[in-house]
Amino acid sequence: AEEVLLLARRTDLRRISLDTPDFTDIILQIDNIRHAIAIDYDPVEGYIYWTDDDVRAIRRAYLDGSGAQTLVTTEINHPDGIAVDWVARNLYWTDTGTDRIEVTRLNGTSRKILISENLDEPRAIVLNPVMGYMYWTDWGESPKIECAYLDGSERRVLVNTSLGWPNGLALDLEKDKLYWGDAKTDKIE
């Protein structure tokens, strides 16, 4: 299988092949992308999912641009981070407008608010579906990185010192390491 990097670049989504020496990026042929913030991929069905802050929606399409659908448009203000649970077939997202973390089935049904208290500016979200955890950043007045079980229970703070605007997360499942990018300190840790 081809290794690719998916990129949400405001008004378009791109895929960059990591199998070619020049890392050429290809713009995905999907209409009406106004302000894409985050993107994730479901390796089971082959859909990409993204948040669009301008149209206040969560959408999906196949990598070739076909099958584009809008999944969530109600009670959504500033959808930000997005993460696919490829095991249980769920979709998680953060909303910096409603200050919530929510989940729905991958087809947009069975929506549920998981966390709505003590969130200031929730941004990035990543999952470890095998172990049953979610991790997210909050870059509000007291910036922090937190985790909880995928059902929102057993919430705890992992990092709350030396952070400015933690807004990117990556999880290395093999090495069990969490990496974050900070837009204020310009660091990746």
Can you name each region flagged by the protein language model?
Residues 1-28, 48:
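An edge-strand/N-cap motif at the start of beta-rich repeat modules
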Residues 2-3, 44-46, 87-89, 130-132, ...:
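Short coil/turn segments that connect the beta-strands within blades of beta-propeller domains
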Residues 7, 49-50, 92-93, 135-137, ...:
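Residue position within the beta-strands of beta-propeller blades
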Residues 8-10, 44, 53, 96, ...:
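Short loop/turn segments immediately following the C-termini of beta-strands
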Residues 18-21, 62-66, 105-109, 149-153:
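Short loop/turn segments that connect beta-strands within beta-propeller blades
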Residues 27-32, 71-75, 114-119, 158-163:
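Surface loop/turn motifs at the tips and blade-to-blade linkers of beta-strand repeat domains
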Residues 35, 54, 78, 97, ...:
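Beta-rich catalytic cores
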Residues 39-41, 82-84, 125, 169-171:
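Hydrophobic core register within WD40 beta-propeller blades
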